[in-house]
Regions:
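Short, intrinsically disordered, low-complexity terminal segments
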Residues: 12-16, 68, 119
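Classical Sec-dependent N-terminal signal peptides that target proteins to the secretory pathway
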Residues: 1-21
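Short helix-capping/linker segments at secondary-structure and domain boundaries
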Residues: 59-70, 157-161
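Compact alpha-helical subdomains of small soluble proteins
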Residues: 72-162
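Immediate post-signal-peptide N-terminus of mature secreted/exported proteins
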Residues: 19-66
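Generic cytosolic/nucleocytoplasmic N-terminal low-complexity/intrinsically disordered segments
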Residues: 1, 22, 28, 39, ...
């Protein structure tokens, strides 16, 4: 029940400082205290949930003024911590071809839609942070709609480099 409350606060109050952990003790607390019933949901579903939380944390951090690189570091630490805290090995997420399993991809796409508003706000900020011209509203919408897939693609790229 405590975890359900924490997750609810995490997604309902994205402007709070806790929504974007930045201090080592916040990451440690998440790792030690945030747990889902992964035996009930399955490790793959839990991994998809954690990937989605990391993706949403990224856009929350960007919207709070963090540079995209810093936002990525924050979301990576969050992901690693909650995966470790829930004793889920990253290898379970991948096929033999080193792609994220389709069931995880689909769940991440669904779950990242929960932070769609935050993603919409973050897209122009991401372009501005890189010194690029803001894309048209149509392109911003497409980027927002495909955010979960982009996030998955980044994870696959990193995993394939190892």
């Amino acid at each position: 029940m405590k975890c359900l409350l924490l997750v609810s606060l995490f997604f309902l109050l994205p402007a709070t400082a806790f929504a974007v952990p930045t201090k080592p003790e916040q990451f440690e607390k998440l790792e030690n205290e945030f747990s889902l019933e992964c035996q009930k949901y399955g490790a793959e579903s839990c991994a998809a949930r954690f990937i989605s939380m990391a993706a949403c944390t990224y856009v929350f951090a960007v919207n709070q003024g963090k540079h995209p690189d810093e936002a990525m570091d924050i979301s990576d630490k969050l992901f690693v911590g909650i995966m470790r805290g829930n004793k889920i090995k990253p290898g379970i997420m991948f096929t033999e071809e080193r792609n994220i399993k389709p069931s995880i991809v689909n769940e991440v796409a669904e779950r990242t839609a929960f932070c769609k508003e935050a993603t919409e706000k973050a897209v122009p900020k991401l372009f501005n942070a890189r010194g690029m011209e803001e894309p048209s509203l149509e392109i911003q919408k497409r980027l927002t709609d495909s955010f979960g897939y982009w996030w998955i693609s980044n994870i696959e790229t990193i995993y394939k480099q190892d």
